[in-house]
Amino acid sequence: MLERLHEQGFADLDAAHLTVFQYPGPQGARPSDLAVQLRISRQALNYLLGQLERLGYLERRADTDDRRSKRIALTHRGELVVRVIREAVAELETTWSRQLGPKRFAELRTLLLELNQHA
């Protein structure tokens, strides 16, 4: 994934940054909620968000419901990263489905989601 992003012009991203772009992505999330979802500390997430903000992938904006809080907003550049990631995942899923067959691939996907919930 990282290699593909670098090829597409996002050479300033590293593997740690990809954590933030995991499905469903950071758009509109509160940093504290995203940290829980990603199972990382708020401090670690804020460090990554700061880097991604400086690199122009996202902004932290005041929450319209609670001015004391912030929400994450992807910039155009951040939205492009999400698009590249989704395209790469779709291609990988198509390849795996072709190799395993649709039924076995569906089973694999179900098992992986189950494992992720218990991680």
Locations of regions flagged by a protein language model:
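The N-cap/first-turn positions of alpha helices
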Residues: 14-18, 78, 93
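Short, conserved alpha-helical segments within structured domains
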Residues: 16-20, 70, 104
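Conserved SAM-binding loop
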Residues: 23, 74, 81
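Canonical helix-turn-helix DNA-binding module
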Residues: 27-72, 79
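Terminal interaction helix/tail motif
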Residues: 80-119
